[in-house]
Curated annotation (Swiss-Prot):
Disulphide bond pairs: 56-122, 169-217, 268-308, 435-481, 522-577
Membrane topology: Single-pass membrane protein
Listed CDD domains: FN3 (cd00063), Ig (cd00096)
GO CC, alphabetical: cell-cell junction; plasma membrane
Lineage of the organism: Eukaryota, Metazoa, Chordata, Craniata, Vertebrata
Protein known as: V-set and immunoglobulin domain-containing protein 10-like 2
Residues carrying sugar: 376, 602, 628
Source species: Homo sapiens
Parts of the chain that traverse the membrane: 704-724
């Protein structure tokens, strides 16, 4: 009965019962039911901001569930929520715990607050065996707080190397126990854990440059684990003593070396924080600022002491390092090889002076390497042990040159034999004996010998020259040139015999027609030294290449003389071909005859008359007798009868031989001219014709009369027509003498009228 009433009682009754139960429970009095209530104690954990469900034990369906909360440190319970299964009520004070709701008999706390930390009591009324029973559940709720994001604090973020630094990992909140861990990461490295450091703070004493970098800490508890952002520990240090490096690298005992004309890069590094400021000095003079000094094209002037100054601007500390830089340069050009022969041995010389350091030279021959020395090296060999074609190489090595420089000598004997010749010098005052034997290494030695095999002067290499005073008694004498070479036995030689020149002419007598072309030929036969050929004209004058009317044409040992447009007055006569050398001369004569062409026939003028206005004449002529001709020549002059008589001048030339007439213009009407004509056979002119003066053309009246008559007839005809026209229009002007009779059968229109008409026609003839 009690259970049924309880199920149907209002909430106010429930709360009243609840309060009673709380009162009884709080007062420690026993439950009014005959049996003691069942109690359960449970510990529950929740996370702040999270959700937790508090269960109210297990058993039969409750009639009433009452939840209360007692904060830590308090003895007074506070009602939280009540439900009878149909209705539920959450007290306003429950918001301090979070978002409170009931799920059946369980109390659900969402968005858990730290204020929910304490003791929860669940009281349940239920019916069992027809009796009302009360059950109690005690729950202790622990609210856990996650650790907050830790923060690293450094006692000195920028300490000087050697000082003391304390690092602290600060956490604002978090349920104990909280565990700490530390990590260090260099600026250009990976992070590494600091083993053994688990406290919220640790000390670096003394601090050094290896401690520079980022420091991070992490904090963790039973709820979570968070890591801090990095805090940078900037350790101030340096600068250390600078270290100088060079590219490309070349090391010497004093420092570095570099090749001339290459790019050289000097780098300076001094460990420092903040980074060092660098200054470069060359021989105590500043040349650059910055860690790298580049010499774009190294030269010899760049040799010297280079100092790198490093400065820490924060600490105002300085360090420096000095090195020696030497610019190497090879000797100029290439090694030079030379051979100095002697009768029984050969000396090989190799020289390559200059350079820094001096080049190292070494000989190498067919049997292997030879001596070595700087700048120059000498090697001697017995001539008997050296076959022709032996090759010797001198190798020059220098640090500034990648490939070695070489010079090579190949010993070989010259080909063939010596060649001898002679020439005259200084106007044939001296005779130069020359001897040549080219090729060979070393070159052959040559010397001249007289007829008694006595040396003439000294000897020389490859070519020997000896001068003799020119005189006639040298003709017929023989000289010998002897050559010697260490690889050639016996000694070869050549002979030279001096002799006067001899001449031959193709034809001693040459004929040519006037105006033609003639060639005189002269050939040189023998002569040592070589002779000079020339031609002398009929007046013994020398014919030069530029002489007018002549042409010289040398062909080997011949000298041809050409005569153009032969003229008897200038070209006829005896020509001499002369050959001269330093030991004698000779000459040959050639007679040149210039023949005239036969005379052409005579010419007579058949007609010579003036043209219009006396400014031209018409000339006609005729040939008298047989003969060859090639043209005509017309001449004129002012007649002696006129005011200005003068010499004959050409009026027309180049007239074809077939022509028999010519119109000549360009006359002055005020001058009286005389004309004559000549026949031409090439350059031969015939006898002039008779001299004639132009005549006026004859008068002809017949054409004038005919012209006048024709003109009169035209005028008469025109006048008659005019008279007839006038009479027809004015008949009264002309009276009739009698009346005409009419003939029967005659048409009036056919009547004739014999009216006389007088017409006067005047004809004037002008001659």
């Amino acid at each position: 009965m009690v259970g049924q009433r309880a199920q149907h009682s209002p909430v106010s009754l429930l709360l009243l019962i609840h309060l009673c139960l709380l009162h009884l429970r709080a007062s420690g009095q026993p439950h009014p039911t005959p049996e003691a209530p069942v109690e359960e104690v449970v510990s529950v954990q929740g996370v702040r901001g999270g959700s937790v469900e508090l269960a109210c034990g297990s058993g039969p369906a409750p009639l009433l569930v009452l939840w209360s909360f007692t904060p830590l440190g308090s003895l007074v319970p506070r009602p939280v929520a009540v439900t009878d299964g149909a209705m539920s009520k959450v007290e306003a004070i429950a918001s301090a715990l979070g978002v409170v709701s009931l799920r059946n008999s369980s109390l659900v706390l969402g968005e858990l607050h730290e204020g929910a930390r304490g003791h929860f009591l669940c009281q349940v009324l239920h019916v069992a065996g027809g009796q009302l029973h009360a059950a109690y559940s005690h729950l202790t709720l622990a609210v856990l707080v996650p650790v907050s994001k830790p923060q690293v604090r450094l006692s000195n973020p920028s300490p000087v190397e050697g000082a003391s630094v304390v690092a602290t990992c600060a956490v604002r909140e978090g349920t104990e126990p909280v565990t700490f861990a530390w990590q260090h990461r260099a600026p250009r490295g990976l992070g590494e854990a600091l083993v053994g450091v688990t406290e919220p703070l640790f000390q670096l004493d003394p601090v050094n440059r290896t401690h520079l970098g980022w420091y991070m800490c992490s904090a963790s508890n039973s709820v979570n684990r968070l890591s801090s952002d990095g805090a940078f520990l900037d350790v101030i240090y340096g600068p250390d003593k600078p270290v100088i490096t060079m590219e490309p690298l070349g090391l010497t005992e004093e420092g570095f070396w570099a090749s001339e004309r290459e790019e050289v890069t000097l780098s300076c590094l001094a460990a420092s924080n903040p980074p060092s400021h660098y200054v470069w000095l060359r021989d105590h003079t500043q040349v650059h600022t910055g860690p790298t000094y580049v010499i774009a094209r190294a030269g010899r002037v760049h040799t010297g002491l280079y100092t790198c100054l490093a400065r820490n601007s924060y600490l105002d500390t300085r360090t420096q390092t000095t090195v020696q830089l030497t610019i190497y340069y090879p000797p100029e050009g290439q090694p030079s090889c030379a051979v100095h022969p002697s009768p029984e041995a050969v000396t090989l010389l190799c020289a390559w002076p200059g350079g820094l350091p001096p080049a190292q030279l070494q000989w190498e021959g067919p049997q292997g390497p030879g001596p070595t020395a700087p700048s120059n090296v000498t090697w001697s060999h017995a001539a008997a042990q050296l076959p022709s074609g032996s090759v010797f190489t001198c190798t020059g090595q220098h640090p500034a040159l990648a490939p070695p420089a070489l010079c090579t000598v190949m010993l070989w004997e010259p080909l063939g034999r010596p060649t001898c010749w002679s020439t005259a010098t200084m106007g044939d005052q001296f005779i130069m004996l020359s001897c040549e034997w080219p090729g060979g290494e070393p070159p052959a030695t040559l010397g001249w010998l007289d007829e008694q095999q006595q040396p003439l002067g000294g000897s020389s290499s490859s070519m020997a020259v000896h001068l003799l005073q020119a005189q006639e008694d040298l003709a017929g004498r023989e000289f010998t040139c002897r050559g010697t070479h260490l690889l050639r036995t016996p000694d070869p030689h050549c002979h030279l015999q001096l002799e006067a020149p001899q001449l031959d002419v193709a034809e001693p007598r040459v004929s040519v027609l006037e105006g033609g072309e003639a060639w005189l030929e002269c050939s040189l036969r023998g002569g040592t030294p070589p002779a000079q050929l020339l031609w002398l004209g009929p007046q013994q004058q020398k014919v030069d290449p530029g002489t007018s009317g002549f042409m010289l044409h040398p062909e080997g040992a011949q000298l041809r003389l050409g005569i153009y447009d032969a003229d008897p007055a200038h070209h006829r006569g005896t020509y001499q071909c002369v050959a001269r050398n330093a030991v004698g001369n000779s000459s040959q004569s050639v007679l040149l005859e210039v023949l005239r062409y036969p005379a052409p026939p005579n010419v007579t003028i058949s007609r010579l008359t003036y043209g219009r206005h006396r400014r031209e004449v018409q000339l006609q002529w005729a040939i008298l007798g047989p003969g060859n001709l090639t043209g005509f020549l017309v001449q004129r002059k002012a007649s002696a009868l006129g005011p200005g008589a003068g010499a004959w001048e050409t009026a027309a030339s180049d007239i074809e031989p077939e022509s028999r007439g010519r119109r000549l213009g360009g006359l002055d009407p005020g001058v009286l001219y005389a004309f004559r004509i000549l026949a031409l056979n090439h350059h031969t002119a015939g006898h002039p014709s008779e001299v004639k003066i132009p005549a006026d053309p004859p008068f002809s009246a017949y054409p004038a009369v005919l012209g006048a008559a024709g003109t009169g007839m035209v005028v008469a005809t025109v006048a008659s027509l005019l008279v007839f026209q006038y009479a027809a229009r004015h008949p009264e002007t002309f009276p009739r003498l009698e009346t005409p009779t009419t003939t029967p059968g005659l048409d009036p229109a056919q009547e004739t009228t014999d009216s006389p008409v007088n017409v006067t026609i005047t004809v004037t003839a002008t001659p």
